Regions:
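Catalytic cores of nucleotide-sugar-dependent glycosyltransferases that transfer UDP/GDP/TDP-activated
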Residues: 1-220
Length: 220
């Protein structure tokens, strides 16, 4: 379902003021989490993991900023449609509102003067621009991030690797007949090129839920 434009957009000063309230002591660490939906509303395994991550982060006196696409998508955001992706921001479990990714990137750059340890963890890239996520990571003063393999979206827009949404395909080569016959085939070509560019531009530490998932992902 297509959502209308938000009535109000946060500015970088708004984000900075929320994370660093006047007169307060800055947290030692700010963890910025990239997710695909609102974990405070949607129930699921990924969302449960994010909830735990937020709890553990804030319990230690640190800050947790979660960014999800304002407009949910079944794929990556396309630059031609969304050159500056709109995201919904949640800070320590409290909704702040919506902002463009360029504003979030600017805020992250400003925050590093007060918070020395700003980290990015990617739970899901559905609806996001990987190019802007890379820019966000660089804005923290780091070239590294963590990325969870909750599924295989980094290998194909069909995150469960089901050809035409029916049968498991095993992430075959792009030139295969399987990709040529699949409704995700054309999108996968653009998708993989952008994923490769992300992994080239950022030092990504991959977190897998099992050895099987890690081995399968590395093999592809």
């Amino acid at each position: 379902r297509c959502k209308g434009e938000p009535e109000f957009l946060l500015k970088s000063e708004d984000l900075v003021a929320s994370i660093l309230p006047e007169g307060s002591t800055p947290p030692d660490t700010l963890l910025i989490s990239i997710v695909h939906d609102d974990y405070t509303v949607v129930a699921g395994g990924v969302q449960f993991c994010i909830q735990n991550e937020e709890y553990l982060t804030t319990a230690q006196g640190n800050a947790y900023l979660c960014l999800s696409p304002y407009q949910p998508l079944p794929r990556l955001a396309h630059d031609a449609e969304q050159p500056d992706v709109l995201v919904s921001a949640i800070l320590n479990g409290r909704a702040l509102g919506s902002a463009t990714m360029s504003v979030v990137i600017d805020a992250a750059r400003k925050i590093t003067s007060s918070i020395k340890d700003v980290q990015v963890v990617v739970h899901h890239l559905l609806g996001h621009s990987p190019e802007q996520v890379a820019d966000l990571i660089h804005a923290t003063g780091s070239d590294a991030c963590m990325l969870w393999l909750h599924d295989f979206f980094t290998l194909c827009p069909s995150h469960t690797l089901q050809r035409n949404g029916i049968s498991f395909c095993g992430a075959p080569p792009l030139q295969s007949n399987s990709c040529g016959l699949c409704l995700y085939g054309d999108e996968r070509r653009r998708h993989l090129a952008r994923m490769h560019a992300l992994f080239e531009s950022v030092d990504i530490n991959v977190l897998a839920p099992s050895q099987f998932a890690a081995d399968f992902w590395q093999a592809h």
